[in-house]
Amino acid sequence: MKSRSLIRVFAALAVLVSLGGCASLSKSECMNANWEDIGIRDGANGRPEEYLIQHSTACAKVNVAPDRGAYLHGREQGLERFCVPHRAYQMGEYGNGFDVGICRNFDQERLQVAYEKGREVHQRSSDLSSIDSEIHDINVRLEDKDKEHPLTKKERDQLMFRLGVLTVERVNAQKAYDQARYEARDL
């Protein structure tokens, strides 16, 4: 019985927190809104046209209605900054999503290629980080001077062998990373 009450309290808190943190615009922003500028900002950030609904909801609390025409005009201007190959590449390189469908009036195929090249660089970078982390962990274990639990000769040999394998894998991963970066140079 007590756990049900606790669950209800946590559920109510979660709802309150989610409602309080959802406003896309503050009261002040709604009252002083330049809807074209807001559209430019949203377009430059790759937000979908439907994001205007969130602004409408936020501003309805202070009886302000968005200027849809100005917003959409601004958003189109913002999309000119967002819907470029370099930005698509960056989104992929940083491991973020990139909805090519937002860029209806742009070269979607070229944007998709740029994004995929960025994703490839991101994956190769992730591979390198993973290998580097494992190399570091092995080196720490090899250097550990724990007298209560020293490594056996067999354990040390296995770690040294794995370190050799990882060193080769790292060279190959670095080549793959460099190749992916090279192939993305002309975006």
PLM-predicted stretches and their roles:
Residues 1-22:
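Sec-dependent bacterial lipoprotein signal peptides
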Residues 22-187:
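Intrinsic-disorder/low-complexity detector
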